[in-house]
Amino acid sequence: MKFSENILISPYGKSTEKGLMFRITNRRDTTLLETSAQLIATTSYQDKNGKMKRDFARLNLEISEIKMFPSLWTVVHPIDEESIFAKHSLEELIKRNIEVLVMIKSHDESYGRAVYARTSYKGDEIIGNAKFKTSSLLNAEGELTLDIDTIGKFVKL
């Protein structure tokens, strides 16, 4: 599997809403089944005694599991009032050493085994006010093609 290099805060849903999103592509020759994603945000803070601590927050996903994963999936955390990204500015979260941990689990039917992938995005890899460029095109025969080298390309808004 290949992950986008960055995770973006992008327009999402209604005009005033935003989502935290990254892309993942299946680089295998086989279709993966029952693919699930989990995101956890972790930040540092100083407690009342001056001791450094870590906070962990599970990030809700628009879709946490897809039954069939043939090519590309944009995983989206809708930023609602419960999200750490709504409660703190991106600058604040970067100061608190935010890291978004990503865990993917899937089933490779061809080999009959579980497939796991993981990555993380640190503060400097979180891009605010941006959106991903299109990675799929229709070829001359009208078939949908995916350029996996462009899954992480984005534009600032």
Task: Identify the meaning behind each predicted range.
Residues 6-11, 27, 42-44, 64, ...:
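Generic structural motif
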Residues 46-48, 62-67, 80-82, 140-149:
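Noncatalytic linker/hinge segments flanking ATPase motor cores
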Residues 101-103:
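Intrinsically disordered, low-complexity polar regions and short flexible loop motifs
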Residues 43-46, 60-72, 121-135:
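Short, surface-exposed linear segments at secondary-structure transitions and domain or protein termini
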Residues 95-99:
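Extracellular Ig-like/FN3 beta-sandwich strand-entry sites
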Residues 110-157:
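Acidic, serine/threonine- and proline-rich intrinsically disordered appendage/tail regions
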Residues 1-51:
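Canonical alpha-helical transmembrane segment with a positive-inside/aromatic-interface signature
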Residues 53-94, 106-113:
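Extended, solvent-exposed segments with strong compositional bias
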